[in-house]
Amino acid sequence: MLGIFKHSLWTQFGASIDSLRNAIAMWPEAYWNTDTKFFYIAYHSQIMLDYYLTIPHTGEFPSTLPFTFSEPGAQPEGVLGDMVPDRIYTKSEMLSYLDATREKCRVFIQNLTDEQMEERWIEGPEEFDMNYAVPEILFYNMRHVQHHAAQLNMLLRQKIDKAPGWVFRADETP
């Protein structure tokens, strides 16, 4: 049963990541530094994908594309959440980071054990901090990626009247 679960989870989670990648790759280079809304959504999607894949959660999160935490309401316009990128990273940097995080996800799912399925991803001690079983944080993460991939596709349609096609499933299997 675990094998079927891991295979199904990866093919769909990988497809969500591939959808995000396709949207980022399609965004015209000419708009990369001028239309920061697209960049900030793409960055947020990637940084949170990596963050939620940091299992077990230890509170430490070194990112390949560094950020600074900001106080609520102090973020630059368009930034989602409190992780503000230290600069506008290039499309190439973003795609490389996404490829590395995709592999991190694939390997994690491939090596997932029954024992790990019982563990919890706990963000912190506060009442409203996230506290999920490992399978649930993986589903949550996949939904989060797909949500923002859809937002990027909408921005693509608005800006260039084009968007990537549907990704049915990821190619590689765990």
State the predicted function of each range.
Residues 77-120, 135-146:
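Acidic/histidine-rich alpha-helical segments that form the ligand environment
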Residues 24-28, 109-113, 156:
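A structural signal for long alpha-helical coiled-coils and helix-turn connectors
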Residues 10-14, 21, 29-79, 123-174:
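Short, contiguous alpha-helical
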Residues 1-11:
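Extreme N-terminal tail/first-helix region
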Residues 13, 17-20, 24, 98, ...:
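Hydrophobic alpha-helical core bundles mediating ligand binding, dimerization, or RNAP-core interactions
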